[in-house]
Amino acid sequence: MYAENYKRFLELIEKLREFEGALIVEGLRDEVALRNLGVRAEIIRLSRLPLAEIALIASRYREVMILTDFDRKGEELAKKLVSYLEGYPCRVDVETRRELKRIAKKDIKGVEELYGLYMKVVSVSDPQLEGFQ
């Protein structure tokens, strides 16, 4: 990750921590990584149920964030989820995933690796990052 992206990466992690809706991830390792980052929001794992059921559960929340992996499969899952959620009144956030992918795709392939990357970023002693650690 380029040094100029460190601050934005940490801002996105803070956004995840403060998120109050439902986060949709692919599996248990993704959920564990997010919990390690301090995320307290409801986390729904795709590995447990069909997409239509996931969408129905997620639709009960005012806001839903899709946080699938950054590979082709994750991209396809995100698109399918967006289409399943279109008929529901919840707000769907895919921008956070897109921005994380843009910033971190050279370093990680998916959500389960976010915590490791976070630890690397906060270990960098940069005065501009003060207050984010």
Curated annotation (Swiss-Prot):
Cofactor: Mg(2+)
Residues at which Mg(2+) 1 binds: 26, 69
Binding-site list for Mg(2+) 2: 69, 71
Pfam assignment, any one: Toprim
InterPro entries for the chain: TOPRIM_dom, TOPRIM_RNase_M5-like, UPF0292
Record carries keyword Cell inner membrane: no
Domain of life: Archaea
Keywords from the named record: Magnesium, Metal-binding
Record GO terms (molecular function): metal ion binding
Cofactor binding, note field: Binds two Mg(2+) per subunit.
Toprim domain residues: 20-100
Family indicated by similarity: Belongs to the UPF0292 family.
Descriptive protein name: UPF0292 protein TGAM_1777
UniProt lineage: Archaea, Methanobacteriati, Methanobacteriota, Thermococci, Thermococcales
